[in-house]
């Protein structure tokens, strides 16, 4: 019997991947986590039924969200990653020897442990001695931070469920205060391809632009993300 995993992009569109077997499944305090093995994408992990990343294309996401701001900012020393429990963003940041401190704030400890077990190439980023992992809510974590970071990367999954607070006006305002004068914030902006998702992207843009005077969008093709067309938002003071 064939086993397929389907990620529903809308109620009329889905992406299905033939899987060899399921490697893990558990409901945590924050989300439903499943790990599958497939021939086409290798191992992939899902959260509440939606693919988070796969071994085959995770590099596109992690490289785009890290190396673009690093290419622009000449003096990044202190970095905050909101989410990022898989370690992929920390891995890409670890290539920059000038970075002194990488704080990763991830609410779900189970997610981190699952990624360490099944996605070691990502999770090795968390082993860098400059990385500090805080198991906390990103919104609350930021409330006490002022003028501390050169770069903030919001690696949260999407503006739903336990990550909804990371796409609010309060969150963007807290990020603005936590950044130094020449600081940069980057976050995954989702896909505007489907009508409902386009509305979500516009709403996120309005909230972020309320705090940051400089805002730009860049894009990448990531096959396992909804529609494959993925945006990233670049914000600066």
Give the location of each predicted region.
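N-terminal auxiliary segments of SAM/dcSAM-dependent transferases
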Residues: 1-44
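Active-site lining segments that contact anionic ligands and/or coordinate catalytic metals
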Residues: 30, 182, 229-230
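Substrate-binding/catalytic lobe of Class I Rossmann-like enzymes that use SAM or dcSAM, i.e.
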Residues: 190-237
């Amino acid at each position: 019997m064939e086993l397929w995993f389907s990620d529903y992009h809308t109620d009329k569109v889905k992406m299905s991947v033939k899987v060899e077997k399921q490697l893990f499944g558990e409901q945590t305090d924050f989300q439903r986590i499943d790990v599958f093995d497939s021939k086409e994408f290798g191992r992939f992990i899902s959260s509440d039924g939606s693919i988070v990343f796969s071994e085959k294309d995770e590099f596109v996401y992690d490289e785009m969200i890290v190396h673009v701001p690093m290419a622009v900012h000449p003096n990044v020393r202190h970095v905050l990653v909101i989410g990022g429990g898989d370690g992929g963003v920390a891995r890409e940041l670890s290539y920059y020897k000038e970075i002194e401190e990488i704080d990763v704030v991830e609410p779900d400890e189970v997610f981190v442990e699952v990624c360490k077990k099944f996605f070691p190439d990502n999770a090795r980023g968390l082993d860098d001695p400059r990385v500090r992992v805080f198991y906390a809510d990103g919104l609350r974590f930021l409330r006490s931070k002022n003028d501390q970071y050169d770069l903030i990367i919001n690696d949260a999954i999407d503006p739903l469920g336990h990550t909804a607070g990371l796409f609010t006006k309060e969150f963007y305002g807290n990020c603005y205060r936590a950044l130094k004068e020449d600081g940069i914030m980057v976050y995954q902006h989702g896909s505007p391809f489907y009508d409902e998702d386009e509305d979500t992207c516009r709403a996120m843009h309005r909230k972020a632009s309320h705090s940051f005077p400089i805002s730009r969008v860049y894009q990448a093709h990531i096959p396992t993300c909804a529609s494959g067309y993925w945006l990233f938002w670049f914000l600066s003071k």
